[in-house]
């Protein structure tokens, strides 16, 4: 557990996969998905507009439509002052001033944020980033085949290429504008927009996949999956995955 002081309150947060309940982790991830794909502030709005313009210029009407729909949802979240990023933080709060915080409904999580309303966004974001990094590092250490983020590495490889090209342009005094523009556009459109609304929206799919996996783990292990912590859940998931792979290899 991590203990911090926010807005004059003593806050205990789950920061380890051997303590964090899987149901909380699922909710936490769900809000992070929304924050990454939609966001809830003006900088996210600007990013949606920039990407939408880029898709129109490329004639990519399908991704433009998705981006525009996400922009509309972003505006709704801004106007309703509902932040998925801070709701993800609330999912990790175990207790405030010794009082357990067990209501994981959106209303319950919002009450946690209201109670800590005196804390600055900067302070909350710093705590969230610190805890998120620790959880991510533990998952990558224990389950490298499940949490090896290849896409993130590819993105930062492109950032390095952009930096190297900009430096080369300065050193060689050569015009590399077209190459630089291509890399910047690639970075801008690196992550394709996801659909969040409707029955096939990312949130619905995320919840359905979790429910299905919980049923499978409970059946295979005889233990209620939703009562597991993150470490136990992914140990079970990894075991089932390896078992299925061995059975498939034998069949061949």
Predicted regions and their residues:
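An amphipathic, hydrophobic-aromatic interaction surface with interspersed Lys/Arg
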Residues: 1-252
């Amino acid at each position: 557990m991590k203990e911090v002081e926010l807005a004059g309150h003593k806050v205990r947060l789950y920061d380890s996969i051997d303590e964090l309940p899987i149901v909380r982790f699922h909710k936490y991830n769900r809000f992070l998905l929304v924050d990454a794909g939609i966001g809830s502030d003006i900088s996210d709005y600007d990013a949606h507009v920039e990407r939408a313009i880029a898709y129109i210029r490329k004639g990519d009407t399908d991704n433009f439509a998705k981006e525009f729909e996400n922009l509309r949802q972003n505006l709704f979240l801004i106007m309703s002052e509902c932040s998925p990023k801070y709701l993800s933080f609330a999912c990790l709060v175990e207790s405030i001033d010794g009082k357990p915080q067990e209501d994981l409904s959106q209303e319950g999580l919002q009450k946690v944020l209201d109670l800590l309303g005196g804390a600055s966004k900067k302070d909350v974001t710093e705590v969230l980033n610190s805890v998120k990094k620790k959880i991510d590092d533990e998952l990558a250490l224990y389950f490298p085949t499940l949490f090896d983020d290849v896409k993130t590495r590819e993105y930062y490889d492109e950032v390095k290429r952009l930096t190297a090209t900009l430096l080369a342009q300065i050193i060689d005094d050569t015009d590399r504008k077209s190459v630089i523009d291509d890399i910047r556009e690639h970075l801008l459109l690196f992550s394709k927009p996801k659909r969040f609304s409707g029955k096939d929206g990312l949130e619905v799919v995320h919840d359905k996949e979790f429910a299905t996996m919980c049923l499978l783990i409970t059946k295979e292990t005889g233990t209620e999956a939703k009562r597991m912590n993150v470490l136990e859940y992914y140990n079970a998931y990894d075991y089932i995955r390896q078992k299925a792979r061995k059975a498939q290899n034998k069949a061949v």
